[in-house]
Amino acid sequence: MRDRVLPLQGIHNFRDYGGYSTRGGKLRTGRLFRSGQHVDATPSDLDLIAALNIEKIVDLRGNHERTLYPCLRPREFSAEVLFADGETAGSGNAPHIEAARDVATAEQAHAAMVRLYALMPFRPKLVEVLRLYFGALAESTGATLLHCLAGKDRTGLAAALLHRLVGVHQDDVMADYLLTNEAGNMERRIAAGAETVRANFGPAMDDAAIRT
């Protein structure tokens, strides 16, 4: 599973989520990519992305996140970027930041994320960009890139929906979703998330809650 992960320096959780067996065959590799945001992409990261020949990018973030964390793009970038004009998360922040409000322990963090996942499929702007995502997959003849802020919750939901739609086995769907917990430099990613959460809500959240 880990060989799906591309070794980028400034982009978290960049990986290929194709290659799985389906009801009618197998998803192609080199066509379906997912990641976190690209605001910290290095020049070598951008060169690698350019070599993937990505035709469409689906940005699951809302307006607030896209303004705070503008993505860097390769030279001669020509991919079409699809997004919803509005907020795809309830507070305008990424789901893991939204869920962190009034959370101090791992148990509270888990309960908050369960509540958040129950709400995500019914958020109008997220549903809007998911429609764009599936439309892009139906129309595209090249590679697509799916991303949000952390490349975890909204991106994980969208990738899992695609996998289930085409008949990827549930065990593979779950394994791909959970690969986020191992992809790339986890400690660095957790540290970045902790900094953002504590900057928004103060230092009360313990380390176990951050990792939940």
Regions flagged by a language model, labelled:
Residues 1-145, 157-212:
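Cys-dependent protein tyrosine phosphatase-like superfamily
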Residues 150, 154-155:
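Ser/Thr-glycine-rich phosphate-binding loops at phosphate-binding pockets of nucleotides
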